[in-house]
Amino acid sequence: MKICVQTNPMVPRYGVDKGFEIIKAAGFDGVDFNFDSYCTYNDMIECKIPDIFTDEAKKEALIEDMIASSKKHGIEIHQCHAPFPSYIKDKPEANKTILEALKVSVEICGRVGCKILVVHPAFNGSARYPTRRSEEWQWSMDMYTALIPSLKKYGVTCCLENMWGQDWITKKI
């Protein structure tokens, strides 16, 4: 059995190399690499996608850092965690940008030798701006379907994050 831990808060605070060193020293065999640590929920809502998803040189630097640090410290990148949220109600431009960030997450995951990417379903979770489960279901199906070519190309399996749920309109969980 391998014992793994999320890279938050070590990698955001100390960087990939030092973060992996600390995680290994704490006795872990591997990590769940959090891409969502590179951006906040508000960044995603405002279409402020981090440059690791948009700047080729920075993406390549992250990939190299992840591979080198994994080898150096004997830490397996067991799975990666995609950015959250993966859907924002009534923000089609943000949703297009987020989908591109998810595709880049698949690419990075595959290129560092990780075969599992956890992707959150469409989830509004807002009583202020309610959605129906059927709306979230449809966006999730569209999003996951759009990821299939990238998942196949990079040999990555998409795992669904389990989310709490409530239909804010019907008040049912």
Predicted segments, located by residue:
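Bimodal feature
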Residues: 15-16, 125
